[in-house]
Amino acid sequence: MSTDTPVLDTIVDITTASIEHNSVSPRDFMLARLAALIAVDAPPASYLANAPAAQQAGLTSQDVEGVMIAIAPVVGTPRVVAAAGHILRALGFAIAVGDAEMAEEADS
């Protein structure tokens, strides 16, 4: 666990453990988790915390779009649009962090 991001690292660890102790496939689990994040209007950090597990489960951008389409009639268009923005902000943050880490390694 990184000492720089202990809360985020703990959430990622919890997510990984919950996948390992679940009876559905990791892919189905992450699809359900994505739907839940959208339904509760989760902030970008929640999507960021779940991104490693979603990637390991093999979720694609088409999967994310499919979940958004499937739940839009239930949770409403505003929630789905907000989720899209939150996901984009989370991805932008992840890219910025990755770029900073690469620059730091290059300076070392």
Residues covered by each model-derived region:
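Winged helix-turn-helix DNA-binding recognition segment
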Residues: L59-D63
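An amphipathic alpha-helical micro-motif enriched in hydrophobic residues
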Residues: M30-V40, E65-V74
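C-terminal structural segments of small proteins and small subunits
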Residues: E65-R89
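Acidic, glycine/proline-rich low-complexity segments that act as flexible tails and inter-domain linkers
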Residues: M1-L31, A39-D41, A45-Q56, V80-S108
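Short basic/hydrophobic patches in alpha-helices and adjacent helix-turn junctions
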Residues: A53-A57, A70-P73
